[in-house]
């Protein structure tokens, strides 16, 4: 996979892309990152990338020319048709399902905005996706773009140590993930549930399923609205409601 980041602050990416899973993914040739300062594509001698909004108002707006030129040139160099992603508060709410969708692509290109926002022509005629990571506003799109890239890259084949690692993550099954424990079995009187040390894999599997459902019911009941509950799971929820 190829992932490009168009940004005015390329230095923000160095630590994240060069660490942990993202660095390992590059070492395994699973992904190739490219960070591009689109200021270099500005067509004026001062390399201006923003201007005052028509109609007045606070803040500055990113001009279309540098962004269009950068995207068109980088796309031509790479060949193909990348998913061109705007990260912005007005976009589609990001989910694990969207991460899985993007992980099937060959080329992603993130446009990281700053200032008051993008010229609307970028949104209407250049981007293929608009993504929001939540109902709040950040200074720029760099942090959300890195977060999305991380969630996508870890899904690529061979990146994680075990292929099933991401299959049990929160949201991958439609539920929050079950609790985890490690040694010691008794720490300051706080004990690991007996079932996890029993060696009975069928009971362990059932415990994890039940705890995953319980955690979702208590913390994110909205996720259960479209979740296909079994009859047994419905009984569990009924018991929890009556406590």
UniProtKB/Swiss-Prot annotation:
It comes from the Bacteria. S-adenosyl-L-methionine binds at residues 113, 133-138. Disulfide bonds: none annotated. Transmembrane segments: none annotated. Its main location: cytoplasm. It is an enzyme of class 2 (transferase). It catalyses: guanosine(37) in tRNA + S-adenosyl-L-methionine = N(1)-methylguanosine(37) in tRNA + S-adenosyl-L-homocysteine + H(+). Its EC number is 2.1.1.228. GO terms for biological process: tRNA N1-guanine methylation. It is found in: Cytoplasm. GO terms for molecular function: tRNA (guanine(37)-N1)-methyltransferase activity. GO terms for cellular component: cytosol. Keywords: Cytoplasm, Methyltransferase, S-adenosyl-L-methionine, Transferase, tRNA processing. Specifically methylates guanosine-37 in various tRNAs. HAMAP family: TrmD. Belongs to the RNA methyltransferase TrmD family. Homodimer. This is tRNA (guanine-N(1)-)-methyltransferase. The gene is trmD.
């Amino acid at each position: 996979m190829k992932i490009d980041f168009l940004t005015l602050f390329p230095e923000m990416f160095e630590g994240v892309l060069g660490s942990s899973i993202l660095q390992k993914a590059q070492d395994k040739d699973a992904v190739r990152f490219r960070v591009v300062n689109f200021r270099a594509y500005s067509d004026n001698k001062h390399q201006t990338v923003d201007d005052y909004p028509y109609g007045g108002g606070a803040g500055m707006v990113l001009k279309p020319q540098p962004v269009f030129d950068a995207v068109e040139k980088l796309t031509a160099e790479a060949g193909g048709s990348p998913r061109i992603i705007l990260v912005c508060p007005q976009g589609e709410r990001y989910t694990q399902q969207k991460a899985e969708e993007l992980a099937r692509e060959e080329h992603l290109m993130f446009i990281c905005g700053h200032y008051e926002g993008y010229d609307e022509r970028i949104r209407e005629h250049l981007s293929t996706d608009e993504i929001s990571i939540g109902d709040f506003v950040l200074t720029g799109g760099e942090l959300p773009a890195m977060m999305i890239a991380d969630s996508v890259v870890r899904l690529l084949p061979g990146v994680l140590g075990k292929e099933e690692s991401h299959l049990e993550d929160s949201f991958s099954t439609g539920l929050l993930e079950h609790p985890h424990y490690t040694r010691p079995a008794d720490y300051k009187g706080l004990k690991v549930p007996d079932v996890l040390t029993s060696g009975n894999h069928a009971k362990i599997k059932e415990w994890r399923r039940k705890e995953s459902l319980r955690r979702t019911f208590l913390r994110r009941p909205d996720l259960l609205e479209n979740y296909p509950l079994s009859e047994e799971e419905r009984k569990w929820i009924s018991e929890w409601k009556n406590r």
